[in-house]
Swiss-Prot record:
Catalyzes the dehydration of D-mannonate. GO terms for biological process: D-glucuronate catabolic process. Belongs to the mannonate dehydratase family. Its EC number is 4.2.1.8. This is Mannonate dehydratase. GO terms for molecular function: ferrous iron binding; manganese ion binding; mannonate dehydratase activity. HAMAP family: UxuA. It is an enzyme of class 4 (lyase).
Length: 396
């Protein structure tokens, strides 16, 4: 397993010196300054590679080349944006970068309601509160027919949340949901958000699948020609929200993706925190079923609460994810690949660490403070080493 670290570029509060000291050898990054849909020029890619190389690091995984909303809705200039995506893939491959993580979530990327959830030990975590989200949909956004997505009890609790909330609480919740979290390339005002939602009025799960299939049939052949691996990130949370369909949430979705364009270059990012929110997702089974297609891993854990649709980010070895079993399955796949002649380790990054210790007094990107991720990477590294010594000595 290759130890990597997500870095948001020159403005990231976590420096590349910090990344190197954490023990990572690879960096997961993107050219966030290039507008969605535009081609990533070779010169800009090489410029970023040079910055990393100066610190003894390599650009291991692109996360992400954003998929333009026109592509997801199959409207507007979608053909132009697809052609640009194809060229960006070619340019990355020209520079020796062979793995691209992306997602196909409508409008929003990953979604949370609380970015400073207090843990019992005093650290802060990210949280998705189903009731707060219902309050946003029903009483702030006022999405038509949203009531159908919530039980009568949830609607009552959401009304109480809204009635008890201050103006500051409402503004903060709204900002957390629609203003854009780290990695998201777009933020919205409420009116802009309502307009975006309206664009999906006639797009159900089957139509979104058709739109994604069109995209994949256009870009996977380019990836094959370039030797580049695509790794789709799952929906976060892995279920429909805001009346929007989600199509990368379950093992059935993974099977559909595999069959739609059956190519080793059409692969997956195994994000244990995203998939793991659903109790019916067996993470080890997913890795075993699609091991040859898993090109990148995000290792973190989440913990479901009394309302199973509410969850918070747990410690990396805690929560509802059996991280030891997950790492075991990844190492088993690495060993299989090694026997087949593929010596490349599967890159992993510690995802969404708690804000703790000295980082509590710093301005950080939510979920991406240094110390919490350092702790997570050290813990996963320990699990990996123990398993290698006990079960996979040839991987040492």
């Amino acid at each position: 397993m290759e130890q990597t670290w997500r870095w948001y570029g020159p403005n990231d509060p976590v420096s590349l010196d910090d990344v190197r000291q954490a023990g990572a050898t690879g960096v997961v990054t993107a050219l966030h300054h290039i507008p969605n849909g535009e081609v990533w020029p070779v010169e800009e890619i090489k410029k970023r590679q040079a910055v990393l190389a100066d610190k003894g690091l390599t650009w291991s995984v692109v996360e992400s080349i954003p998929v333009h909303e026109d592509i997801k809705t199959h409207s507007g200039q979608f053909e132009t944006w697809i052609a640009n995506y194809q060229q960006s893939i070619r340019n990355l491959a020209t520079c020796g970068i062979d793995t691209v993580c992306y997602n196909f979530m409508p409008i929003l990327d990953w979604t949370r309601t609380d970015l400073e959830y207090q843990m019992p030990d005093g650290s802060r975590a990210l949280r998705f509160d189903q009731i707060a989200f219902a309050a946003f949909e029903l009483h702030i956004l006022k999405r038509p027919s949203a009531e159908a997505d919530y039980s009568a009890e949830e609607q009552q609790q959401a009304l109480k949340w809204f009635e008890d909330a201050s103006d500051a609480d409402i503004e903060k919740l709204t900002r957390n949901i629609i203003a854009g979290l780290p990695g998201a390339e777009e933020g919205y005002t409420l009116d802009q958000f309502r307009a975006r939602l309206a664009e999906y009025g006639d797009i159900d799960k089957n139509q979104l699948r058709e739109n994604m299939a069109y995209f994949l049939r256009a870009i996977v052949p380019v990836a094959e020609a370039c030797g580049l691996r695509l790794a789709v990130h799952p929906d976060d949370p892995p279920r429909p929200i805001l009346g929007l369909p989600r199509i990368v949430s379950t093992i059935e979705d993974m099977q559909w993706l595999k069959e739609t364009v059956d190519s080793i270059n059409n692969g997956f990012t195994m994000c244990t925190g995203s998939y793991g929110v659903r109790e019916d997702n067996d993470l080890v089974k997913m890795i075993e079923a699609f091991g040859d297609r898993i090109h990148f891993t995000h290792l973190r854990a989440t913990c479901r609460e009394n309302n199973p649709k509410t969850f918070h980010e747990a410690a990396h070895l805690g929560g509802d994810v059996n991280m030891v079993a997950v790492v075991d399955a990844i190492l088993s796949e690495e060993q299989r690949r090694k026997h087949a002649g593929d010596m490349r380790p599967i890159p992993f990054r510690p995802d969404h660490g708690h804000q703790m210790l000295d980082d509590l007094r710093k301005k950080t990107n939510p979920g991406y403070s240094a110390i919490g991720r350092l702790k997570g990477m050290a813990e996963v590294r320990g699990v990996e080493l123990a398993l290698k010594m006990l079960k996979y000595p040839e991987l040492l």
